[in-house]
């Protein structure tokens, strides 16, 4: 069937208008295949059906995701924990020993009236039925159980304390808890099955400023890398080599988590995107994107 000249002009114009409206209205999108997953949230609606919200996490306030509790006037509250997980599982490895590469980015706003903001935000990967551990407010970032609730009979099992069998995380830690191995300054860190980070880097957290976290796993080099940056050029970078198939189950979920304790801060997520693919070496190492 022939297409008129008027119709041929209309199609590209219509396509442009549609794409423009998607950008203006910040429409989220996702694609899901057996061995690949992509999603992008440019804003969060009040009824965000493709997220699993846990604890104090809420969506819809100014189009943002609030991971921890805030008052009606937006003030942060203490002793809060919340998480958001994408609903679809991720195929992170398969029996042929092929492991997925992935790329995650989120923008965030941490704001605190306290002289010591606490406690931070983490991007994490865990088993598909993951839930918030008991006692994981404050320094444990909603990811790891507290020593006081891990007990063997009446004795605390310190080997199990602060550990989780199926957690890989990149933490943006705003408050140094040196008693659990933190360096004595705000930092970013890579956590493998424990809140005691395998690798850390000093982070100049900017109170009330929007920052960006970019996380990459290159399955060819088995390197997990992260960069946290601000518009003024300040950044922190950390990397650690890990075989994800030795740490995580074959199918996982990805999420964002945050907590407050005695000190407090808002833990606001403005956008979040994620892409993973098995048998892919197309996702670059962090050094090529910074």
Curated annotation (Swiss-Prot):
Residues 149-163, 282-290 form a propeptide. The record marks 148-149, 163-164, 281-282 as: Cleavage. Ca(2+) binds at residues 119, 173, 175, 177, 182. Residues 1-29 form the signal peptide. PROSITE patterns: LECTIN_LEGUME_ALPHA, LECTIN_LEGUME_BETA. The mature chain consists of residues 164-281 followed by 30-148. To form a mature chain the precursor undergoes further post-translational modification after removal of the signal sequence; cleavage after Asn at positions Asn-148, Asn-163, and Asn-281 is followed by transposition and ligation (By formation of a new peptide bond) of residues 164-281 and 30-148. Glucose/D-mannose/rhamnose specific lectin. Has hemagglutinating activity towards rabbit erythrocytes. Has mitogenic activity towards murine splenocytes that is inhibited by glucose. Inhibits HIV-1 reverse transcriptase with an IC(50) of 35 uM. Has a potent antiproliferative activity against L1210 leukemia cells in vitro that is not inhibited by glucose. Inhibits translation in cell-free rabbit reticulocyte system with an IC(50) of 2.08 uM. Lacks anti-fungal activity against M.arachidicola, B.cenera and F.oxysporum. Binds one manganese (or another transition metal) ion and one calcium ion. The metal ions are essential for the saccharide-binding and cell-agglutinating activities. This is Concanavalin-A. It comes from Canavalia gladiata.
């Amino acid at each position: 069937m022939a297409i008129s000249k008027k119709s041929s002009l209309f199609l590209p114009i219509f396509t442009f208008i549609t794409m423009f409206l998607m950008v203006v209205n910040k429409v989220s999108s996702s694609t899901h295949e057996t061995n690949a997953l992509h999603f992008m949230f440019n804003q969060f609606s009040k009824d965000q059906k493709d997220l699993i919200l846990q604890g104090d996490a809420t969506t819809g306030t100014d189009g943002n995701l609030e991971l921890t509790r805030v008052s009606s006037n937006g003030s942060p509250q203490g002793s809060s924990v919340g998480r958001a997980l994408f609903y679809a599982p991720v195929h992170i490895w398969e029996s042929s020993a092929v492991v997925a590469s992935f790329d995650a980015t989120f923008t965030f706003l941490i704001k605190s009236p306290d002289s010591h903001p606490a406690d931070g935000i983490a991007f994490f990967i865990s088993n598909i039925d993951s839930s918030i551990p008991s006692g994981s407010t404050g320094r444990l970032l909603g990811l790891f159980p507290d020593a006081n609730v891990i007990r063997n009979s009446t004795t605390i099992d310190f080997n199990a304390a602060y550990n989780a069998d199926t957690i890989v995380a990149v933490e943006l830690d705003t408050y140094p808890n040196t008693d659990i191995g933190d360096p004595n300054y705000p930092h970013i860190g890579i956590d493998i099955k424990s809140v005691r980070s395998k690798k850390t880097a000093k982070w100049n957290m900017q109170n009330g400023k929007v920052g960006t976290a970019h996380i990459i796993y290159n399955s060819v080099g088995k390197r997990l890398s992260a960069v946290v940056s601000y518009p003024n050029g300040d950044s922190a970078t950390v990397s650690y080599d890990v075989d994800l198939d030795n740490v995580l189950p074959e199918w996982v979920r990805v999420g964002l988590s945050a907590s407050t304790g005695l000190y407090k801060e808002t833990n606001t997520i403005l956008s979040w995107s994620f892409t993973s693919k098995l048998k892919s070496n197309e996702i670059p190492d962090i050094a090529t994107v910074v």
